[in-house]
Amino acid sequence: MHEILTVTFGRKSNFCWTHFWNTQESYFVYDPNDHAKVNVNTNFRVLKKRDPEAIVTVPRECIYDTPIEFGNTRKNWLEELNESSGGKGTAWDGKLTQIMQTPVDVHPYQEALWSRDEIHEGNAIESEYELPSIRPKSVKYWSDFNRLFLDTEYLFPVNCSELNSSDFSFQLGVERFHDFDKQFNVWDEGLRPLVEECDSVQGFQAAIDIDTPWGGFASEYMKVVQDELGECRVPTWVYGIREPIQSDSSATIDNHFGKLNEALSLSQLNGSCSQYFPLCTISQGDDLWASSAKINLAIESFTLPTRVYGSSCYRMKDIESKLQSEGRGFIHNLNFKAKNYSSKEWALVSSASFVNVAQDYSQQNNCLFGVVRSPKDNQGLLEGKNYNASSISKIVNIQNLGLPSLETVPEGLRTLDTVFVEATNDGQINSHIQGLTKSLNRRFVSFVDQDELEEIREILSSYII
């Protein structure tokens, strides 16, 4: 196997990756006569109950967030597992109690999932069970629409509500990380056991709320990971998730802190990650649940080659070689478009990295690596004036594997089964970095001396192509 391990930090990141994991669950094949198109072992691991025939599949993931954001995770099954196995010790028992003591209303969708679990307890294959639709604006926590069981040993609540706010500083996250690491060793209690379970680690992916103090927390975390890995370098992709950056004329103080947090995080991630993808969560009229579902269209499709079977399979290192082949740096924006296969027009054309605009990026022919996927033949999607031979050679063509239709996404996205996503490095990235560099005002970074500030500016400037 070529496993991928995931770490998520913060509310926005966990919203995005909950959509990601829900999509992965749809690839599970329960009938031994069916042919699996996706190797779910890449991103999932198996846990066993007291009954050796009862198993559950959980993500290869460590989740960091504030306690309230865990809401009501589907932990009933795993509580029994924890009791029988003893868990990881007293440190975890304390953290689990902290989550359970937080009074949170159960979302109707979660109630329905729990009812289904009780009905199908012990059954390997679930029969039909009608689940309610999720109403817009009804989702408070990412756990409200999470379909999967999560291994409670790898849920890490950090008791600091300010971590999810962009009006608090990067330095707060750094301090909270070191406090947390002293109490719960983030390597020994987190990633190390997951790494040791793997046969051959393909890479790591980390999603970070980059405009909040989580940026400081995660930057320190990534340094620890790289120190522990030593010379054993594997692809490490970071998705920096933020809210839209306003123009200087309309920017509020917390928006300025958001830019500052991203600037400091990005400078500190230098050397700790091999690829960086900025992502922007909020689009016009959408709540976080809806906008993160759109981002998942891009993330899930872009990374699909890392887990499919057959000739369309690309490991993370293979994709990195494509991204770096033209010397375009390690920061890339993700542009995508989506539609129903039967439709001639693209229903959604956008950027996952910057504020959504209706622009067909594929016309620019600056794709470094792309993926097109649909439920049928894709050849017609790659023909026409927008794609020359050079562009097509950089695009992975995944046929007969459309985007699944899930009840956990907004209704308007459920019919979109055809997606084209590409990674580019263009003027938008350069402008974004220049804007971040300007945010490094001594008035807001008093914890950094002048020499360090100049070094940070130089690091950011080196990212400009």
UniProtKB/Swiss-Prot annotation:
Pfam family, one: Misat_Tub_SegII
GO molecular function, one term: GTPase activity
InterPro entries, sorted: DML1/Misato, DML1/Misato_tubulin, Misato_II_tubulin-like, Tubulin/FtsZ_GTPase_sf
Keyword set, alphabetical order: Mitochondrion, Phosphoprotein
GO biological process entries: mitochondrial fusion; mitochondrion organization
Annotated compartments: Mitochondrion
Coiled-coil parts of chain: none
GO cellular component terms listed in the entry, alphabetical order: cytoplasm; cytosol; mitochondrion
Sites of Phosphoserine modification: S446
Described purpose of this protein according to its UniProt entry: Involved in the partitioning of the mitochondrial organelle and mitochondrial DNA (mtDNA) inheritance.
PANTHER family tied to this protein: MITOCHONDRIAL DISTRIBUTION REGULATOR MISATO, PROTEIN MISATO HOMOLOG 1
Family affiliation: Belongs to the misato family.
Name of the featured protein: Protein dml1
The encoding gene: dml1
